[in-house]
């Protein structure tokens, strides 16, 4: 170490300090700024990428929430449509049953009316035939007692009117 101190030159030392400071100034002016700019740009790029990733993650979560909401709404709408369709089907079935019952009752009433009409017509025909037969029988039996046919018809109708047929 003593040898180094003996070889020490103040002029060389000052020259080395001036060169070192000059080198630092040159590096600061030409290299340091581009290096810091590149580091800052890289840092900003990383921050932007992280923000973009966070925004994308948030957007993805929002989209998933929207998809779930839309899916839930679609399910509710489907359930409501199925419920409405079932109600319409049941109403149509009930209406058809009611209409069929009404038509059945109407047909039964028409059939009863037709039967009653036929029955009355048959009864009238039967009464007419019975009265004609009765007249013929009475005419034969009572030919001597009643000479007038009108009186004979009145008597038979009176007797048939007294007899009620079911």
Curated annotation (Swiss-Prot):
Superkingdom of origin: Bacteria
Cross-referenced Gene3D superfamilies: F1F0 ATP synthase subunit B, membrane domain
One GO location term (cellular component): proton-transporting ATP synthase complex
Transmembrane annotation, as ranges: 7-27
Keyword terms: ATP synthesis, Cell inner membrane, Cell membrane, CF(0), Hydrogen ion transport, Ion transport, Membrane, Transmembrane, Transmembrane helix, Transport
Protein purpose: F(1)F(0) ATP synthase produces ATP from ADP in the presence of a proton or sodium gradient. F-type ATPases consist of two structural domains, F(1) containing the extramembraneous catalytic core and F(0) containing the membrane proton channel, linked together by a central stalk and a peripheral stalk. During catalysis, ATP synthesis in the catalytic domain of F(1) is coupled via a rotary mechanism of the central stalk subunits to proton translocation.
Similarity field: Belongs to the ATPase B chain family.
Protein name, entry field: ATP synthase subunit b
Organism: Flavobacterium psychrophilum (strain ATCC 49511 / DSM 21280 / CIP 103535 / JIP02/86)
Gene: atpF
């Amino acid at each position: 170490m003593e040898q180094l101190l003996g070889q020490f030159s103040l002029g060389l030392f000052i020259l080395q300090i001036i060169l070192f400071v000059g080198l630092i100034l040159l590096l600061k002016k030409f290299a340091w700024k581009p290096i810091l700019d590149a580091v800052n740009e890289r840092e900003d790029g990383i921050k932007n990428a992280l923000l973009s990733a966070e925004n994308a993650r948030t957007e993805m979560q929002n989209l998933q929430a929207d998809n779930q909401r839309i899916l839930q709404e679609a399910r509710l709408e489907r359930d409501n449509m199925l419920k409405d369709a079932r109600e319409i089907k049941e109403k149509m079935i009930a209406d058809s049953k009611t209409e069929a019952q009404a038509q059945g009752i109407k047909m039964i009433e028409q059939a009863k009316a037709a039967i009653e009409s036929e029955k009355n017509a048959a009864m009238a025909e039967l009464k007419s035939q019975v009265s004609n037969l009765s007249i013929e029988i009475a005419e034969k039996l009572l030919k001597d007692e009643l000479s007038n046919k009108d009186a004979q018809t009145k008597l038979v109708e009176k007797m048939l009117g007294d007899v009620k047929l079911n």
